[in-house]
Amino acid sequence: NPHFLGPFDQGDYKLGDFAYLQPTIDRYAGSFARHGVGARHGLHSWTVFDPMWADEKWCEPGEDLITCEFRLQNPSVLFVRLGSNDAGAPSGFRFNLKEVIEFAIDNGVVPIIGTKADRFEGSNENNDILRSLADEYDVPLWDFDRLAETLPGRGLDTDQVHLIIDELPHDYTDPAAFQRGHAMQDLSALIALDQVRRAVEE
């Protein structure tokens, strides 16, 4: 997804006071703008392990998208952001997320659980589930929902689900960047990734 961390591979950013994050950008260079088969529009938690959602161009017959992603990329870290398309079945969402988290851990991958800015399910129960599971499994939590509360309109577009897409650079020397959903999503995700990198390398 070019709208998630992509500018950090494309060089279209100025870190300003966050220059301490540059070693993390360098460490994961090439990972931000590449094609990821594990990211799909409209993905539900229950379709992560459904081969019907896998990219036929990249994935083997019968292979689900997360298994395909792990085979192709051999990741050390996985951002888990689900819930916007999971409404009305919180117990199912919890069960499915547990499967994703356990799959990552079983494969030696650190899952970073990310909360979402929207309220598509009509409440905030999916974010509460995400927080609860991060605590239960003792894995990193990237609580973007808390940051979204500080943004105009939570940083969301008119559909109230997706963040507003802009083509502006991530210039963190410009105060306006701290009012934009994508710029703050990427900065906060990079901070979370930096914390994980430091913990792993200690």
Protein language model annotation of sequence segments:
Residues 79-85, 98, 102-130:
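Active-site segments of SGNH/GDSL-like serine hydrolases
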